[in-house]
Curated annotation (Swiss-Prot):
NCBIfam families: rplM_bact. This protein is one of the early assembly proteins of the 50S ribosomal subunit, although it is not seen to bind rRNA by itself. It is important during the early stages of 50S assembly. Belongs to the universal ribosomal protein uL13 family. The lineage of its organism: Bacteria, Bacillati, Actinomycetota, Actinomycetes, Pseudonocardiales. It comes from Saccharopolyspora erythraea (strain ATCC 11635 / DSM 40517 / JCM 4748 / NBRC 13426 / NCIMB 8594 / NRRL 2338). This is Large ribosomal subunit protein uL13. GO terms for biological process: negative regulation of translation; translation.
Length: 148
């Protein structure tokens, strides 16, 4: 029996929707990255994009454990001398909650062309609504919710 190697045209990409409400940021990011890479499929191959589309809703309600809201920072650089900008996770979450999730998830993908293609299949929305109902996304449950 020969080893099966998936081809780019043979792969079907399903759609998953994840509700981020009260889910710990890192636990959500690892599950989303796993779906984007396609490691949940028996036909996974590291050199082919076998992953699925992931829609994350309620990004503004994601949970941060401990004091990360105030003590963990998000850095970005303009490219100019002295252009380093630093914001706490809380500031980023208040202003652009989808950016925090996108950075966490994309940081868990490969740093090459294939990883960038996988990152394009990630759709993050701050609220409960998303424009992808026509794709019939299947709910994906994450069991790492924070008890309040």
């Amino acid at each position: 029996m020969r080893t099966y190697s998936p081809k780019a045209g043979e792969v079907t990409h399903a759609w998953h929707v994840i509700d981020a409400e009260d889910v710990v940021l890192g636990r959500l990011a690892t599950q989303a990255a796993l779906l984007l890479r396609g490691k949940h499929k028996p036909t996974y191959a590291p050199h082919v994009d076998t992953g699925d589309f992931v829609v994350v809703v309620n990004a503004e309600k994601v949970a941060l454990t401990g004091n990360k809201r105030d003590q963990a920072f998000h850095y970005r650089h303009s490219g100019y001398p002295g252009g380093l900008r630093k914001q706490s996770f809380g500031q980023v979450l208040d202003k652009h909650p989808e950016r925090l999730l996108e950075k966490a998830i994309k940081g868990m993908l490969p740093k090459n062309k294939l990883g960038r293609a996988m990152g394009k299949k990630l759709k993050v929305y701050a609220g409960p609504e998303h424009p992808h109902q026509a794709q019939n996304p299947q709910p994906f449950e994450i069991n790492a919710k924070v008890e309040k």
